[in-house]
């Protein structure tokens, strides 16, 4: 009996997350430069939509975070909308896209975080190029 009283507070303090419906981390997205703009190709399935977007760099004032209601539908063959974010050569970036799929009743049945991490440079003509990409 004494051990039950010790076990209960220990379980409460550990923050047990059994059955946590949080999003899964998925494979890295592909980063390309198209018309001197960054293009993120997300490995999404049919019916998957973007509920949030975060673009991070070492300068906190240049970070971007957006939430979308209703979510924006994505395609694995089209660039993910980055809303005119101004990427600059010589900087490192991380992009995180929260995606979700809903059933016919509108309930979220699956959620993922798609991510990309990369450094930008410039070629001799001043065009952006991806120097490194973590995949």
Give the role of each language-model region.
Residues 2, 25-27, 63-68:
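Short, intrinsically disordered, charge-biased short linear motifs at domain edges
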Residues 2-9:
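Sec-dependent signal peptide recognition
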Residues 12-15:
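C-terminal motif of bacterial Sec signal peptides marking the signal peptidase cleavage site
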Residues 24-47:
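Contiguous beta-strand segments within globular domains
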Residues 8, 30-31, 69-72:
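Secretory-pathway extracellular proteins and peptide precursors enriched for disulfide-bonded cysteines
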Residues 17-19:
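Bacterial signal peptide processing site
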Residues 41-135:
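Acidic, low-complexity Ser/Thr/Gly/Pro-rich repeat segments typical of extracellular/periplasmic
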